[in-house]
Amino acid sequence: MKHAEYEYLNLCRHVMEHGTKKEDRTGTGTVSVFGYQMRFDLSKGFPLLTTKRVPFRLVASELLWFMKGDTNIRYLLQHNNNIWNEWAFKNWVESDEYKGPDMTNFGLRSQEDEAFKTQYDEQMEIFKKNVLEDDEFARKYGYLGDVYGKQWRAWKTAAGETIDQLKDVIEMIKKTPDSRRLIVSAWNPEDVPNMALPPCHTLFQFYVADGKLSCQLYQRSGDIFLGIPFNIASYSLLTHLIAHECGLAVGEFVHTIGDAHIYTNHFEQVKKQLAREPRPFPTLKLNSDVKSVFDFEMGDLTIEGYDPHPAIKAPVAV
C-alpha cells in the first residue's frame, strides 16, 4: 500500500506541474490550484510529515492556544513558539508608538538585505521581550484580533452573547453523534477586517461512524510548503483529543483546500522535499488520566517513533 504521505507529496507535485501563476497580497507570487482534497487514515499512524521535520511541539502548543480561546501571542512565546510573531510584530512597527528603523515590507526585505535583516532581528527581539514582560504592551501589540481561539470558544452573537462552538460540538458528538451539524466555523464576516490574518482554516466538521470519529477541514487558503504540514498535524491532533474525550476511536482526517498554493520562493525547497522517500508515520500518545480536551497541557502529548528527514527552511510570506 502506498504511504499516506504521498497524499501531500502528490499535492506538491500537482501544483508545481499544473498550478496557475498568481500575484498575492504579500508581493511574493504563487502558483496555485483551486479545490484539492487529501485523506489520512488516523488509525494507521499520526500524519506528521517525514520527508522534512515538522516540529510537533509547535503544532501542539498552537492548537492548545486555540483551544484555550487565546488570541494573544504571549502564551505562544512562553512556550517558545514563534510562528505567529510576524503578524503581531507588523501591528507594532506600523503604529505611532514605534520609533525604531523603518520596517516597511520587512518580510521580503529581511530575505534580500543582510544589513536590514540584522536590524529586523534586533527589533523582533525587542518586540518579543516587551510582549513577555510588559502587560500593557502585550495587550496592545500581542493581540491578533478575534482569530481562531476567539471564534472557536467565544463567537459573538447579535444579542451580545457568546457561543462556545468547540464545547458545544463536543457535547453534540456525545449526545447526537449522527448529527450533520457537528461544525465549528472560524470565519466571522463581521470580525474578519479586524483580524491580523483572516482564518485560513475556516471551518471543520466531525462525522461519527462505527465508533470512529472523523474530521473534515475546509481551508480557504493553504501555503503548501510551510502551512499545510502544520494544518494536517494540528487537525489530526484535535481529532484524537476529541475522540479521546468522547470515548471513540479515530477515523479519517479529510483535508479540503480552496486556494492551494506554493510561493515562488519555496520552489527549490519543494523540489528537495519531493526527492525524498517517506518514512513510517509516528504514533501519538495521550495521557489517559486527562479526560477533558480543555485540560490537556504540553506534557500530556507525546510523539513516538518519529524519524523524519532533516528540516528544510523557507521564508514566511507576511
Curated annotation (Swiss-Prot):
It holds the Pfam family Thymidylat_synt. One of its GO terms (cellular component) is cytosol. Its EC number is 2.1.1.45. InterPro entries: Thymidate_synth/dCMP_Mease, Thymidate_synth/dCMP_Mease_dom, Thymidate_synth/dCMP_Mease_sf, Thymidylate_synthase, Thymidylate_synthase_AS. GO terms for biological process: dTMP biosynthetic process; dTTP biosynthetic process; methylation. Belongs to the thymidylate synthase family. Bacterial-type ThyA subfamily. Catalyzes the reductive methylation of 2'-deoxyuridine-5'-monophosphate (dUMP) to 2'-deoxythymidine-5'-monophosphate (dTMP) while utilizing 5,10-methylenetetrahydrofolate (mTHF) as the methyl donor and reductant in the reaction, yielding dihydrofolate (DHF) as a by-product. This enzymatic reaction provides an intracellular de novo source of dTMP, an essential precursor for DNA biosynthesis. Homodimer. This is Thymidylate synthase.
